[in-house]
Amino acid sequence: MISSDPEAVSASAYREAMAQLASAVHLVTTDGPGGRAGLTATSVCSVSDGPPTLLVCLNRNSSAYPAFLRNGVLCINTLTAAHEGLATDFAGRVPQAERFAGPDWGRLQTGAPVLAGALVAFDCRIVDRHEVGTHDVLICAVEALAEISGAESLLYAGRHYRVLPRTESKGD
């Protein structure tokens, strides 16, 4: 069905359509006066490289949401194929207090938790926030990076985790 009437698109139809899209899987983490918290997210996007800026969308009903706002910092940890279980844990399978018990965590510039072995970690300061529907779009200035090479990226598509194998880039 093709429709241009926004009222004709139900929330369930929209969620079903979005489930068909493949997205990288991230653990978004924070720490500071509001406490340590984290969640799994696929709604992360580059905004600009000058200055380096990302956006992440967080549901205002999430138990972790107040900590992100109070702390004003976050780290977007992009997951590898080895982190599927961790992605499920941070998606709500385990309580907030137990989510950081597993792998090694470090810190970069902002103090937000950085997952050791993440494909890449974007250490950010929240510089703007926009309310849209049930979510906030957080605009985040990247203050530091950590990355590894050779790992396979974890994706989420069709309501299942998938792996995107790394390929060698071919020179000209």
Swiss-Prot record:
Q: What class of enzyme is it?
A: oxidoreductase
**Listed EC numbers:** 1.5.1.42
Q: Show the Gene3D superfamilies listed in the entry.
A: Electron Transport, Fmn-binding Protein, Chain A
Give the molecular function GO annotations: FMN binding; FMN reductase (NADH) activity; FMN reductase [NAD(P)H] activity; riboflavin reductase (NADPH) activity
Reactions catalysed, semicolon-separated, are: FMNH2 + NAD(+) = FMN + NADH + 2 H(+)
**What SUPFAM superfamilies does UniProt report for this protein, alphabetically?**
FMN-binding split barrel
Cystine bridges: which residues? none
> Which keywords annotate this record?
Flavoprotein, FMN, NAD, Oxidoreductase
A GO biological process this protein is involved in?
nitrogen utilization
> InterPro entries per the record?
Flavin_Rdtase-like_dom, NADH-dep_flavin_reductase, RutF, Split_barrel_FMN-bd
General function of this protein: Catalyzes the reduction of FMN to FMNH2 which is used to reduce pyrimidine by RutA via the Rut pathway.
- Family of this protein: Belongs to the non-flavoprotein flavin reductase family. RutF subfamily.
Q: What is this protein called?
A: FMN reductase (NADH) RutF 2
- The encoding gene: rutF2
